[in-house]
UniProtKB/Swiss-Prot annotation:
EC number: 6.5.1.2
Keyword DNA damage on entry: yes
Amino-acid positions noted as binding NAD(+) in the UniProt annotation, renumbered to this chain: 41-45, 90-91, 120, 143, 180, 296, 320
Protein's job: DNA ligase that catalyzes the formation of phosphodiester linkages between 5'-phosphoryl and 3'-hydroxyl groups in double-stranded DNA using NAD as a coenzyme and as the energy source for the reaction. It is essential for DNA replication and repair of damaged DNA.
GO biological process, any: DNA replication
Catalyzed chemical reaction(s): NAD(+) + (deoxyribonucleotide)n-3'-hydroxyl + 5'-phospho-(deoxyribonucleotide)m = (deoxyribonucleotide)n+m + AMP + beta-nicotinamide D-nucleotide
UniProt GO cellular component terms: cytosol
Originating organism: Kineococcus radiotolerans (strain ATCC BAA-149 / DSM 14245 / SRS30216)
Enzyme kind, highest EC tier: ligase
Cofactor: Mg(2+); Mn(2+)
Binding site for Zn(2+): 414, 417, 433, 439
Lineage per the UniProt record: Bacteria, Bacillati, Actinomycetota, Actinomycetes, Kineosporiales
Protein name (database record): DNA ligase
HAMAP family: DNA_ligase_A
Length: 696
């Protein structure tokens, strides 16, 4: 809802307007999405009449999205990308009590004794970010990449546990809440029963069901699914202060937000271990799926001192339970050819349920792994889901063998193009199809790869679409993708109607391809399918060089100097660029209008060009991510290790051993005030003045 310009409107009238808008929007949502009517027609009409009269009396109150200016039934989810007010971090994992103890020991080293621990079951659901302004739910966003997610506000509002308005005392002006959307197991069973009855495939597990239900374009579909939600943290906020995590949970519950009834605060690691053990034994007694226990330092001041890494808070950890294991029959071993030519064997299994999912295939990684595991086609094998996610064959049940089993023989030629397979290097454990230019499998996988969220994120470009475009001959390879036209798609049955015109799905593909031309350079680099270059390396290259042209002109030594890149990735980039048709892909994309350079913010001075900065300890004015970004945006290199090549070490509270090492090596040490001066003025701003000569 747009902000109302109060002007000369009396506060009583403004508050009544806000109340009327909230009631009408709630009634519309219930009617058009939930198919329920909390108000009679007469009551609803009376509210609208009062709102219109109030806006006639005070025109300043009338906004473009007021109920008097909009049609009631226009509720749809477009999945637009939205920035999180505060980044959604992940959690580091512990898979044993030893790893949990090591984490607790690090906490004690950093903050001393006295930390208390909040324990809660780790829900296996879909992370969600809710934003409330003046107590009113204004946005619901999926986690996405932690910085940005998809707007699913209308869908979230259908979830039974999500309050549209916070109630109670001291509701904050602004509140970002983190939680998990999931299914109770009985709700999941009911959904699947309905799908089977309707002749549709059931969901594999409750988490997939939750994700699929929340990402419906029509929120009326989401409203039919019995989704639940629990909150487990807060992000950005104004008007809410708390000293403990458990105290924050109490406030959230008092305002009407659902928190877990199983949260427990304990004083010792032994009590944490007991909590973990209890839910490990009773995980299937919980009404929803859990895959571990989350342990957090309860005291907020200690959380601040501990800080965060680039991906996870240091004051929290997820203890992951051992994955479930089952036995089933290994029906066959087949191979898959990936986008870089890697040939990977996979197991074809008698379908079996493990960790809540039905598994029919599992990875075997490579031929050496098949030999190491000792599995034969026809074996009874032990299957688990590593991390409760990726199916994996552990090995055979040897005593169940009948003698009819047979060994798997790795093919010597590509199953898709017939090219002889080979190791790319003598020490390469994988065999590859060297026909990267025209192998149908590699072409298909590379085109499909561009659809991924880590690359160009192109909707309507699934694996079937990639295959159809190549089979129809409208593209020769990924280089042609961004020049597709409607005339091209007329020749692709997948994208045409019975009348021979381009379908809505085809038009959506073209629109998506057009929109995705304007992407950060790192996404373009990922999209090129250069071996070893994933999002992390691509970001480092984009930060270091800024443009594709600069990368093309760089030597292997230049590329290896980018932080986190090194000689292996540098060699892969140089080798890739040495291939003519690879450079043709870059040329085609450039000519099609794909952005090949990042625009640098010229307003930020490049005061740290060529400098390596280490920040250690907690700073009052910067989070760790903010300090790193401040260094990178000014041309510097942010490092986590102190060496003779370090230019400056910035020391905050609880700095630890890095400050001592800096002094031993003679590296200049700055406090936070010095860091700010360095950012603004460069090395000259923090240089010690020479002593003035004595007099007399």
């Amino acid at each position: 809802m747009d902000t109302v310009d109060g002007g000369d409107v009396p506060s009583e009238a403004r508050h009544r307007w806000e109340d009327l808008v909230a009631q009408i929007e709630a009634a519309r949502f219930a009617y058009y999405v939930r198919n329920s009517s909390p108000l009679s027609d007469g009551q609803y009409d009376a509210l609208e009449r009062e709102l219109r009269a109030l806006e006639e009396q005070h025109p300043q109150l009338r906004t473009p999205d007021s109920p008097t200016q909009t049609v009631g039934g226009t509720f749809s989810t477009e999945f637009t990308t939205v920035d999180h007010p505060e980044r959604m971090l992940s959690l580091d994992n512990a898979f044993s009590t030893d790893e949990l103890s090591a984490w607790a020991a690090r906490v004690e080293r950093e903050v001393g004794a006295g930390a208390r621990y909040l324990c809660e079951p780790k829900i296996d659901g879909l992370a969600i970010d809710l934003v409330y302004e003046d107590g009113r739910l204004v946005r619901g966003v999926t986690r996405g990449d932690g910085r940005t997610g998809e707007d699913v506000t209308f869908n979230v509002r259908t979830v039974e546990d999500v309050p549209h308005r916070l109630t109670g005392a001291d509701v904050p002006e602004f509140l970002e809440v983190r939680g998990e959307v999931f299914f109770h197991l009985d709700g999941f069973a009911a959904i699947n029963a309905g799908l089977v009855e309707a002749g549709k495939p059931p969901f594999a597990n409750p988490r997939n069901a939750a994700a699929g239900s929340l990402r419906q374009k029509d929120p009326r579909v989401t409203a039919t699914r019995p989704l639940r939600m629990l909150v487990h943290g807060v992000g950005a906020r104004r008007g809410m202060e708390n000293d403990t995590q458990s105290g924050a949970y109490e406030k959230l519950a008092a305002w009407g937000l659902p928190t877990s009834p199983r949260v427990k605060v304990v004083d010792t690691l032994d009590e944490v271990a007991e909590y973990v053990r209890f839910y490990g034994e009773h995980r299937h007694d919980v009404e929803h799926e859990i895959d571990g226990v989350v342990v957090k330092v309860d005291q907020v001041p200690l959380q601040r001192r501990l800080g965060s890494t680039s991906r996870a808070p240091r004051w929290a950890i997820a203890y992951k339970y051992p994955p479930e294991e089952v036995t089933t029959s290994l029906l066959d071993i087949q191979v898959n050819v990936g986008r870089t030519g890697r040939v990977t064997p996979f197991a074809v299994l008698e379908p079996v349920k493990v960790a809540g999912s039905t598994v029919a295939m599992a990875t075997l990684h490579n031929a050496s792994e098949v030999v190491r595991k000792g599995v034969l086609i026809g074996d009874t094998v032990v299957v688990r889901k590593a991390g409760d996610v990726i199916p994996e064959v552990l090995g055979p049940v040897v005593e169940s063998r009948t003698g009819a089993e047979r060994e798997f023989v790795m093919p010597t030629v590509c199953p898709e193009c017939g090219t002889p397979l080979a190791h790319q290097r003598a020490d390469d454990v994988d065999i590859r199809c060297p026909n990267s230019r025209s192998c149908p499998a590699q072409l298909r996988e590379r085109v499909f790869h561009l659809a991924g969220r880590g690359s160009f994120d192109v909707e309507a470009l699934g694996d079937k679409a990639a295959a159809a475009l190549l089979q129809a001959g409208v593209i020769a390879d990924e280089g042609d993708l961004f020049t597709l036209t409607e005339d091209d798609l007329v020749g692709v049955p997948l994208f045409t109607t019975k009348a021979g015109t381009v379908s809505a799905n085809g038009r959506r593909l073209l629109a998506n391809l057009h929109d995705r031309k304007d992407q950060p350079l790192w996404r373009v680099l990922v999209g090129l399918s250069i071996r070893h270059v994933g999002p992390t390396a691509a970001r480092a290259l984009a930060d270091r060089f800024g443009s594709m042209e600069a990368i093309e002109a760089a030597t292997a030594e230049d590329i290896a100097s980018a932080e986190g890149v090194g000689p292996t990735i540098a060699e892969a980039v140089v080798e890739w660029l040495a291939v003519d048709w690879h450079r043709d892909v870059v040329r085609k994309w450039r000519e099609a209008g794909v952005r090949m350079a990042d625009e640098r913010d010229e307003s930020t001075p490049r005061t740290l060009e060529g400098l390596t900065i280490v920040v250690t300890g907690s700073l009052s004015g910067f989070s760790r991510d903010e300090a790193k970004e401040a260094v990178l945006s000014r041309g510097g290199k942010a490092s986590s290790a102190v060496s003779k090549k370090t230019s400056f070490v910035v020391v905050g509270e609880a700095a630890g051993s890095k400050a001592d090492k800096a002094e031993q090596l003679g590296v200049p040490v700055l406090d936070e005030e010095g860091f700010v001066a360095l950012l603004e003025g460069g090395p000259d701003a923090v240089a010690r003045p020479a002593e003035e000569p004595g007099q007399g």
